[in-house]
């Protein structure tokens, strides 16, 4: 494994991609420290300290601590994710967008452009809501959060937060295209990982004050290790459908006749469902947290992590996005047609429509299992943790994102190394981390 890491620096392109990604992630973390003008940071920090364990704390986790400081990156990448969700949903019902999706690279660029426009619009709406809400907020000590309220502050805040989100979106796209891994996922990953030392410090502080016992801390560590183990095991799990290729004679040579398989991942949607589900819930909740209206606050309290309504809503969105994302990224009809053209068939299943129906049936069952797995990982640890006042960063959602993104990034690095005939991180084919099929 050590030799595998050493091989990274022997491949110039891979080394350049990794350093490029790390450099942009450092730029992102620097931007998290730059506050929006006109805000009392101490007053805002005291409000977030009082909001620990609420949905506002979960939103702050996904922003990497930027919301707590109200930095220029306070909105994080969530407006971009929300815009992506809206565009993907519209693609299924709007003929023009569906046609663009089928046009290949040019169509994809056009949809990406629409996603960027949507990101800016959502950022303006969310930024304005936060600006107005901040003007009504006061710290527990009575200090006002906004030093000079008014339209100048609102306009400056909207412009700053929108520009910050647009810059994060650009960073993510650059990492995906010129770096290693998925840029958007890595930005969320870095935000969670960078906040974990703070969460560990908070846990030890609770331990020192006697609010939690040593037995609970040990139980928490065991639970975390078990959850990480389950995530690694399931994320690499596959259902392999056997495929046979008929023999064909071309000239004097015989082709085909070999046996292979069609790999279907148990969780083919990866970390997308919990990220999308969190984004949907957080968008209205973020604005609600900054608006001091009783009925709005009641809604915000109802969708607080650990509450049954929040967990039920979260699971519902996870199931929806597991099936929706799988349907968007994997088309059984196309797979069956390509298999038929290449002379392949599933033993006992007729090529063509019957093969597509069989693959769709298997995929639906696997997706159900994957959705149950993602829901259990995200919800069950969070329910237990919320009852013991432990930071969110040890919850299932954070662990699934961290481990899932790490596996995906390692898979890409491993693929680069094996393509250039270098040994991967783990010796032996069975031990290697397999990439998503």
Give the role of each language-model region.
Residues 1-101, 106-437:
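N-terminal cationic and glycine-rich segments that engage phosphates or anionic surfaces
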């Amino acid at each position: 494994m050590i030799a595998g890491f050493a091989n990274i620096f022997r491949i110039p392109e891979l080394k350049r991609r990794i350093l490029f990604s790390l450099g942009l992630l450092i730029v992102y973390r620097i931007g998290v420290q730059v506050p929006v003008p006109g805000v009392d940071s101490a007053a805002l920090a005291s409000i977030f300290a009082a909001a620990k364990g609420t949905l506002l704390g979960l939103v702050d986790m996904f922003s990497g601590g930027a919301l707590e400081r109200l930095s220029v990156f306070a909105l994080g990448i969530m407006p971009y994710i929300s815009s992506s969700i809206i565009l993907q949903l519209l693609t299924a019902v709007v003929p023009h967008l569906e046609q663009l999706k089928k046009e290949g690279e040019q169509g994809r660029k056009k949809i990406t452009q629409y996603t960027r426009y949507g990101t800016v619009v959502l950022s303006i709406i969310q930024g304005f809501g936060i600006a107005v809400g901040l003007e009504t907020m006061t710290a527990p000590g009575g200090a006002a959060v906004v030093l000079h309220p008014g339209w100048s502050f609102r306009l400056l805040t909207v412009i700053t937060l929108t520009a910050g989100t647009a810059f994060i979106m650009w960073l993510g796209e650059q990492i995906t295209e010129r770096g290693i891994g998925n840029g958007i996922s890595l930005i969320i990953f870095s935000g969670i990982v960078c906040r974990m030392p703070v969460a560990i410090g908070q846990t030890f502080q609770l331990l020192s004050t006697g609010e939690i016992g040593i037995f609970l801390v040990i139980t928490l560590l065991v639970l975390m290790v078990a959850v990480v183990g389950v995530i690694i095991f399931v994320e690499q799990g596959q259902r392999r459908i056997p495929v046979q290729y008929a023999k064909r004679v071309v000239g004097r040579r015989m082709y085909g006749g070999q046996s292979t398989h069609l790999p279907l991942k148990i969780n083919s949607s990866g970390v997308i469902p919990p990220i999308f589900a969190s984004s949907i819930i957080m968008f209205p909740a973020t604005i609600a947290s900054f608006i001091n209206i009783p009925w709005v606050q009641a809604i915000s309290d109802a969708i607080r992590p650990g509450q049954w309504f929040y967990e039920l809503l979260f699971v519902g969105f996870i199931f929806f996005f597991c099936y929706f994302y799988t349907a968007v990224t994997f088309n059984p009809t196309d797979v069956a047609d390509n298999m038929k053209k290449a002379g392949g068939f599933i033993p006992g299943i007729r090529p063509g429509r019957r093969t597509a129906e069989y693959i769709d049936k298997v995929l639906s069952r696997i997706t159900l299992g994957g959705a149950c797995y993602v829901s259990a990982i995200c919800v069950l640890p969070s329910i237990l943790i919320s009852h013991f006042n432990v930071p969110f960063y040890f919850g299932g959602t954070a662990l699934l994102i961290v481990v899932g993104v790490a596996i995906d990034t390692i898979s890409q690095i491993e693929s680069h190394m094996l393509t250039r005939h270098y040994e991967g991180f783990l010796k032996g084919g069975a031990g290697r981390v397999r990439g998503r099929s």
